[in-house]
Amino acid sequence: MTRWLPERRSRRIVLAVVAAAVVVFGLIQLVPYRVDNPPVTQEPPWDSARTRRLAVAACFDCHSNDTHTYFWEDVAPVSWWITKHVKDGRAALNFSECTKSGGESGDAVETIRNGSMPPGYYTWLGLHADAQLTAKERQELADGLMRTLRGAGCGGGG
C-alpha cells in the first residue's frame, strides 16, 4: 500500500527547511538597501508641460530623485533589485540633476522610440499604468525630450 503522507522524519526535514527559509528571509530584511530620494538640484528646461507630464509618468521613477515605490518594493530581495535598477537609471539619465550645459539627448530619445523604455516589466500586472504610453504619446515624449535635453547635462549622452 502506498503512503500518501511523508514519513515523520521527512516532515521534520521539510519543516526545518521552511523554518530556515523564513528566518533567512527575516534576516535579509535587516540589510539597509533601499531607494533614497536626494534633493532635486535642477530639472532641465522643459520644452512643454506635456513633455514633463509624460516624462514624470514614464521615466521619473528610475530617472529622477523623485522615485515612488510600492510597499512590496521595499521588501528584500526585491528592494535590492529595484535600488540597483534606479541607481543605474539615474547614472544614465537623471532629470533631477541637470546642469546648464553638456549632455546629449540621443540615447534617451532612441530608447523611447525603439520601445525599450519604459521597460515592459515596469507595467506588468497593471502597475505604473500611467507609464503605458500609446504610440502617439511615445512619439510626443521622444520629440519633446529631444528638444528639452539638447544641451542639458542630465547624463546619458548620445
Place the predicted regions along the sequence by residue.
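C-terminal capping alpha-helices of c-type cytochrome domains
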Residues: 126-155
